[in-house]
Amino acid sequence: MSSSIIVPYLERYGTEEQKKKYLPKCVSGEITTAIGMTEPGIGSDLAGMRTTAVRDGDHYIINGQKTFISNGINAGLFFICVKTDLTATPAHKGISILLVEDGTPGFSRGRKLKKLGQHSTDTAELIFEDVRVPVSNLLGEEGKGFYYLMDKLQQERIMIAIGALVVAEEMLKTTMTFVKERHAFGKPISSFQNTQFEMAEMATEISMAQTFVDDLTYRHMNGENVSTQVSMDIIAKNLGM
């Protein structure tokens, strides 16, 4: 997740100074990254976020909370979405992204959240109380954060859909083995017509989703904007849930 979803923000929009400082450590695994979008009571409604960053000379002062943040406990570098312009119309034009290092005064972690799956990454709450970060930690341009997110969320959603499809394919293989080995009324349940219908439907849905995701991946890698189609791949992701 850190290298395939979050680091591309730095590679695409970071300054040369930021890249030289952080990219080698990201590549070596010395630090992992996390991105903070979701907030308590707001969810992923970016325009409604309440975490603010107020300019104070050569620094921004961050106040607010984030929740459901993947890698929140173990990350060493955080890409935090903040409101730098509270009067912007529409509201999403006031969003920026700031780089916050672990250990910055005023930054702390809340609970490590319990979850059903994806235990290879932790999920946590983040708290910002008068956290001062230098202006040089601004990713890209002020007020452009929403556009950066919309660009990179395409890749994030495709990656998640690919992972879900891998899970779905393994589920199909496991189920196929089970119905061949499980016997009822003196014969394997794979010989029952209803079982065959269910297995055929599962295989068909996975094949359709695979074709759809492969097409999105190809178009995205060739620079095409597939944001609308990527929103549709929730269907593909549901196969792996």
Identify the residue ranges that each predicted region occupies.
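A structural signal for short hydrophobic beta-strand segments in well-ordered beta-sheet cores
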Residues: T51-V54
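Active-site pocket-lining segment
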Residues: A200-N222
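Glycine-rich beta->alpha junctions and the first turn(s) of the following alpha-helix
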Residues: F107-M208
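Glycine-rich phosphate/cofactor-binding loops in nucleotide/flavin-utilizing enzymes
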Residues: I5, M150-D151, Q155, Q229-M241
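Internal helix-loop-helix
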Residues: M1-K20, P24-E30, S70-L77, H220-E224
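A short core secondary-structure module
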Residues: N63-R109
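A short, Trp-centered hydrophobic/proline-enriched beta-strand micro-motif
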Residues: G29-M37
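Short Gly/Pro-enriched turn/cap motifs at secondary-structure boundaries
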Residues: C26, G41-S44, F68-N71, A88-T89, ...
